[in-house]
Amino acid sequence: MTEHGKHAFHVRDDHGILVRPALASDVPHIQRLIAPYVDRRILLGKENVALYGSIQQFRIAEGPDGTPIGCGALAVFWDDIAEVRTLALDEQWIHKRVGHRMLEALEHDARELGVARIFCLTFEVDFFAKHGYLEIGESVVSPDVYAELVRSSDEGVAEFLDLARVKPNTLGNTRMLKNL
């Protein structure tokens, strides 16, 4: 992590970028940010009601002028595992380290919550590999935990477990995991 301390992500960096917790009023911005990726079938679309219901999981990256330029969420699955999801940037801000800063903030949140491992389902294998994520195959949870998780209605949990019912949504994606 390049910043230090609990409030490190609540200040603008040298490029004027601020990563902060999302507000309910950010939902239209999240929809705007994910729309190009949904159109290209890189991300699944989300209804506004789902975004409002999970807004506390999201972080927003603001550009120097205060406009939201990135979003990402951290969803906890179990006592030791969470998923980075809905990580998206305004395409003008790709390759300008905003994604790195967003991921660092979400990993910071995971550590604050006591989570030991972070999962992601991604087409951006190189990006996540640079941050220490490794490709995974079979289940990385015990049979008892699997039996609990398989009852979840959360699509992200189903993707983590690699369940057949979500296979059409995950074709071409790589399942990756990082130990914090």
PLM features: what roles do these ranges have?
Residues L89, H95-H108, F119-C120:
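Conserved acetyl-CoA-binding loop-helix of GNAT-fold acetyltransferases
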